[in-house]
Amino acid sequence: MTQLEAIAFDDRGVPLTGWLAQPEGEPRAAVLVFPTIANVTPAIERRAQMLVDRGYLAFIGDFYGEPVPDFAAAQRLAAALRGDVDHYRTRLEANLNTMRNLSAATGLQLAAIGFCMGGQAVLELARAGKELAAVVSFHGLLDTGRPARAPVHPRILVCHGDQDPMVPREQVMAFWQEMDAAEAHWHFHAYSGVKHGFTDPASDSRGLAAVGYDASADRQSWAAMNNLFDELF
């Protein structure tokens, strides 16, 4: 297991902590990993390790800068963060800029991936015109308070559970139209019968009807990301 290194930074005076994991040898690229609404968890740390195993530098972002003791607290913190688009995007950009400015990331191409709220976060970076090679959203929310406008720089991959009640088909169709209008280069993978949170085996133990693990969708979505990254990096 690769050792995670704490990286302190801030956003407009709010102290934040990212977590850096580095491969042996020269990284193929630097990948920002945005967590779920619960912020950094063992599941997200495992994803960082999986990226390191494939030769990438991984930097786990921090949404809140404070502990998340339970789901109610996560909902409160997320609502406060996402309630204003400018506030939300500035926090996301602080994470991206911190990774970009790491000495270990000098000269590397940049990508971002995210899960649940993190999936929405990487799409917001793309919408904001950030110069990334790729963004990948796993069971991310697709709505936004500020739709994308050209140019959209990164390649976009969305991996979506078709039975995710948090992202109804109307939202999916609106996202497609938004991406086309912005002339984005996008891929959209939908998995039939699959719920929200399909990449996390712990989803089945949360007692929430909206979420559930799906081993096949988990494998296929990660493979889709790897295929895209292999093409780019």
Tell me what each language-model feature is.
Residues 103-115:
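Alpha/beta-hydrolase fold nucleophile elbow
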Residues 158-160, 164, 191:
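Short beta-strand/loop motif that positions the catalytic acidic residue
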Residues 114-118, 122:
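Gly/Ala-rich beta-loop-alpha elbow adjacent to hydrolase catalytic centers
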Residues 168-178:
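Short alpha-helix in the alpha/beta-hydrolase fold that links the catalytic acid
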